Amino acid sequence: MNTRIGTTGNASPLAADAYPMIDPFGRAVTYLRVSVTDRCDFRCTYCMAENMTFLPKKDLLTLEELDRLCSAFIAKGVRKIRLTGGEPLVRKNIMYLVRQLGKKIGAGLDELTLTTNGSQLSRHAEELYECGVRRINVSLDTLDPEKFRKITRWGDFSKVMEGIDAAQKAGIRIKLNAVALKGFNDAEIPDLLRFAHGRGMDLTVIETMPMGEIDEDRTDQYLPLSELRADLEKQFTLTDIDYQTGGPARYVRVEETGGRLGFITPMTHNFCESCNRVRLTCTGTLYMCLGQNDAADLRAALRATEDDALLHTAIDEAITRKPKGHDFIIDRTHNRPAVARHMSVTGG
């Protein structure tokens, strides 16, 4: 598989009309995140309420329809696709879509990857590798099994560890994602860093984002990563490096471990100026920005005709509405989310 990780790998040949999707601010849209389901087998406190109401299954696009949509985006210049959720691996027959997309690697698509909570990885790791998946993100906010249960509500820490083991054994590279939560896991980040780097994994820490009504108070959870970095620099030597994965993280090298640590800071230092992505939901709704409510309905165009001309027109129109930046802000006055939909709808 050709990869686009850092400066390694060779990108697949590009057509003469490569990167035809250019937004109003001159940014090429080359990255599609596909939320294949809003359902999850965890109920992480910063992501969703414990008693969630999920989309009726009849409202979901079929996997064949999602494949067709992804193919349309690849034809329009998308080079990287990430499957997300909810938890993508709980979608019934999800490996069908993975297999179909895997066939497009080297034929327009450079990379297929996914973000997962790890709970289903032990069952799917080998097949993911066989389909061309070479790296994944695993969400892990703590190494303490009791705290893990508290934050995920329903999660089994041992199953996630089994999944990480299985993925690494299969040859898949892993990046751990940890949401930094004040008073909960901020003191644990050094341990997460050592754990990740000790197993050859990158670690990225993320500021909590104000999306959807949850049971917790985000104003209590929010931790600026500038503060976290200052605390880490009391223990580690952090050197800024020019390392890119196509995402918003800014990376440092941890001299004591030799590993990489990423910071995703939507609240304190947004990454909008280099945004190269759009987000497709399992119902065919396209969000041009994670932190805005504007969206385009692609399902109608998809189902109107078997020809893709109308679909391509709908995609083009949507890209013209991609905003300059998001509207994230922690509202300490009213304690309400900046965006009403939950993270599980658009997949981060």
Swiss-Prot record:
GTP binds at residues 33, 82, 115, 175, 277-279. [4Fe-4S] cluster 1 binds at residues 40, 44, 47. Keywords: 4Fe-4S, GTP-binding, Iron, Iron-sulfur, Lyase, Metal-binding, Molybdenum cofactor biosynthesis, Nucleotide-binding, S-adenosyl-L-methionine. Binds 2 [4Fe-4S] clusters. Binds 1 [4Fe-4S] cluster coordinated with 3 cysteines and an exchangeable S-adenosyl-L-methionine and 1 [4Fe-4S] cluster coordinated with 3 cysteines and the GTP-derived substrate. Its EC number is 4.1.99.22. Pfam families: Fer4_12, Mob_synth_C, Radical_SAM. Pathway: Cofactor biosynthesis; molybdopterin biosynthesis. Residues 24-242 form the Radical SAM core domain. One of its GO terms (biological process) is Mo-molybdopterin cofactor biosynthetic process. The keyword Iron applies. Its cofactor is [4Fe-4S] cluster. S-adenosyl-L-methionine binds at residues 46, 86, 139, 209. It comes from the Bacteria. Catalyzes the cyclization of GTP to (8S)-3',8-cyclo-7,8-dihydroguanosine 5'-triphosphate. Belongs to the radical SAM superfamily. MoaA family. Monomer and homodimer. This is GTP 3',8-cyclase. The gene is moaA.
